């Protein structure tokens, strides 16, 4: 059995270390070593455990989610910031420029924007376009959800977009192959609240407004240093063809487990929390399991990250009985958690030149009405006649898929050098 374990560790370690070289970090990167060890898991004591370890992303997704969590949140602070590793990666602002550049160390600007999903508006002649505006703490108004958002991608993801010129519409028109990201790709979508606005964010939930319980970082707005608290984030990786999907929230988020509950079979005790009948309230803290506590103890990470909870993971569009799976968090999918499915929503990420112009695919099913798609993808979203004779080539494509990455159709730079995701 020790030989089998060595094979598992070798396969997983090789896959992740190969990606590690592309991360532009030192060859002896302790964060990557920790993640490789975490993904390999404990030495299997049975054939079932051995087989589970062969494909942990599908067989043990909650553990894999925490392995990724500890990796992307590895302490990367330098003078003047409190960066986790993902905060040093490329943002949409870095990626969707006429000349994308990997960010340098120690930036004091966090490129926050208003959350994308609640701010979609209809585009003529069809489809939806993101209504993206820069976010700052000065925009916070009484009675409004005051949240900023950012998307970050690691070096392999950034390089794939840059090297294939997928950051411009002209580049997408010229790229004739199927878009398939490398297996070491990782993306994070993070939501932040100004620390000074935490009381308003938590109002009515019974949660304490204590910034020390949060991962905090600062940015410069109008020449002033402003502190932000991390409240939630999505985390995806290309370990499997349809990516891994996980969402995390701070333990004190109002309504954290509303509608779909919270489920974490690896890191939480108890592993499942049912939704309250009265929405918007505080839920009990997600007490960490002994296995997860041991992983935290061996990681170089801001201690405040122990206050974050895995809301859930997603590995497929449906369960084994064909029931549509759902996943969404109370901040990013605020207002439509009941119809949120990360894998289905991102599976619709696509663009079209079919009418001669440019159009990203719709996010919501009914234009700007916030009803998300769930379940398997509809081939009619991509092909004009998807049910034609299977022995003949499919008819004209309508939309071209972007391998579950919405930033490409949302943010691709137009002929004038502008991106809808980048403030000028």
Which residues does each predicted region cover?
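Bacterial N-terminal signal peptides that target proteins for export
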Residues: 1-10
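Bacterial N-terminal signal peptides
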Residues: 9-18
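Sec/Tat signal peptide C-region and signal peptidase I cleavage site
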Residues: 20-24
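Conserved small-residue
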Residues: 25-344, 348-424
